[in-house]
């Protein structure tokens, strides 16, 4: 029993729409045709090749449709993917569809820098502090400033500051939400290690550059980690005390606290009315309450200002670090860097078989290239050793698929599940 078709989809990497290795006259294609004959069919999947997360995700959606159509048109064929560089990430994102992933017999990745993307744990406390502080401190400070000055004209400054704080808070929330959604989209599917072949070259320039960029990814979150370090203990103490107060005071204590807050609000309103020269309605002009309400928002505002000032002073450094991430990771990952961790690794998460080619093995016999000529990142798909490894991998996967199909047929004939000895 033999397969009628072996269909291999070739996926190029970044900035390589017209690369030669996916063409019929390339060494890889010629060698595979020689070994597998007429039953081998090669298809090329072109995509933009832009070094952007959105470009790779968009290409993954199109590749998913491309593979689904091939499987629908050739259900009895064995389907493989061979990808180079970020084309491997495109293929992995396409296989996030579990149904499609189960129908792909194997994936070969040449020099793929697998991007591991995770949401930053450090952004939670710092982000929460900035959001709550900006939303809650500005109206209190506005009222306190009105009370202290007694002049209407001075109310414009805190009002503008408050509106800017709300706008900044909303932008911060949108920024963080978008970044975490991007991280979720850039996750890898679950695959059996026997269905993935990884080939890499010693001295891969792209991997070295991406590895260095991972350090800038870590440093870019320093402002938020700093805010988180400052605010973590106060937030924890507030949460602990709030639990204690609720447990000890109960419903009666909470009602008393709410009543006290109501008195504070009425006192503040009376002073605002006085500052605006509006006829006052009854309010409790209690000096201690007024003083408490005046100092509390000022303390909150000063604390917020201190917490916001440190990361603000570090903005130039942050922009400098993000600039170093633009070229290796693309602008989306660079912008999301304060909220996500991005590292380029030799493999996806898990246990895999990886073949590391030496510098000499990256050259075809009788090649006239010098030892320093050409990019090692682009030499793998022309390596005789790499092409032989791909051929062996394809043969092993075909044999495994054949055994599986024969076992399924035997089970149907015997009416029971075939048990391996």
Each model region followed by its residue ranges:
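Terminal low-complexity/disordered tails
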Residues: 180-192, 196, 201-203, 210-421
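A short, Lys/Arg-enriched amphipathic alpha-helix followed by its capping loop at the start of a domain
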Residues: 24-40
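Short amphipathic alpha-helices and their capping/turn segments at secondary-structure boundaries
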Residues: 1-2, 99
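Extreme N-terminal starter segment of soluble prokaryotic enzymes
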Residues: 2-8
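Serine-dependent carboxylesterase/thioesterase catalytic core
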Residues: 8-19, 23-28, 47-225, 239-256, ...
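Hydrophobic helix-cap positions at the C-terminus of alpha-helices
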Residues: 35, 70, 98, 343-346, ...
């Amino acid at each position: 029993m033999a397969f009628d078709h072996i269909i291999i989809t070739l996926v190029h990497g970044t900035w390589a729409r017209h690369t030669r290795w996916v063409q019929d006259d390339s060494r890889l294609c010629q060698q595979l045709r020689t070994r597998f004959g007429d039953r081998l069919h090669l298809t090329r999947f072109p995509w933009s090749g832009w070094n952007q997360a959105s470009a790779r995700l968009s290409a993954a959606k199109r590749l998913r449709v491309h593979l689904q159509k091939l499987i629908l048109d050739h259900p009895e064929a064995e389907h493989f993917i061979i990808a180079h560089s970020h084309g491997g990430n495109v293929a992995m994102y396409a296989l996030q569809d579990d149904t499609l992933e189960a129908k792909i017999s194997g994936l070969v990745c040449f020099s793929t820098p697998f991007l591991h993307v995770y949401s930053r744990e450090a952004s939670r406390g710092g982000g929460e502090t900035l959001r709550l502080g900006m939303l809650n401190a500005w109206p209190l400070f506005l009222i306190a400033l009105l009370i202290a000055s007694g002049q209407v004209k001075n109310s414009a400054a805190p009002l503008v500051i408050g509106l800017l704080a709300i706008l900044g808070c909303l932008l911060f929330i949108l920024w963080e939400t978008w970044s975490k959604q991007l991280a979720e989209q850039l996750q890898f599917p679950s695959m059996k290690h026997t269905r993935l072949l990884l080939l890499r070259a010693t001295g891969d320039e792209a991997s070295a550059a991406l590895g260095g960029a991972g350090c800038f990814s870590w440093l870019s979150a320093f402002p938020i980690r700093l805010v988180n370090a400052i605010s973590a203990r106060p937030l924890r103490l507030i949460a602990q005390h709030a639990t204690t107060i609720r447990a000890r005071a109960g419903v009666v204590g909470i009602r008393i606290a709410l009543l006290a807050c109501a008195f504070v609000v009425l006192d503040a309103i009376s002073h605002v009315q006085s500052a605006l020269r509006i006829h006052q309605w009854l309010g409790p002009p209690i000096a201690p309450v007024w003083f408490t309400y005046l100092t509390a928002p000022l303390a909150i505002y000063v604390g917020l200002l201190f917490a916001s000032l440190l990361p603000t002073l570090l903005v130039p450094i942050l922009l400098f670090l993000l600039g170093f991430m633009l070229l290796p990771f693309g602008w989306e990952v660079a912008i999301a860097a304060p909220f996500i961790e991005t590292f380029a690794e030799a493999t996806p998460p898990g246990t895999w078989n990886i073949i590391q080619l030496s510098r000499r093995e990256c050259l075809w016999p009788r090649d006239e290239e010098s030892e320093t000529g050409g990019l090692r990142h682009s030499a793998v798909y022309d390596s005789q050793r790499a092409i032989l490894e791909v051929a062996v991998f394809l043969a092993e996967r075909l044999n495994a698929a054949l055994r599986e199909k024969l076992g399924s047929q035997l089970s149907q004939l015997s009416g029971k599940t075939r048990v391996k000895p």
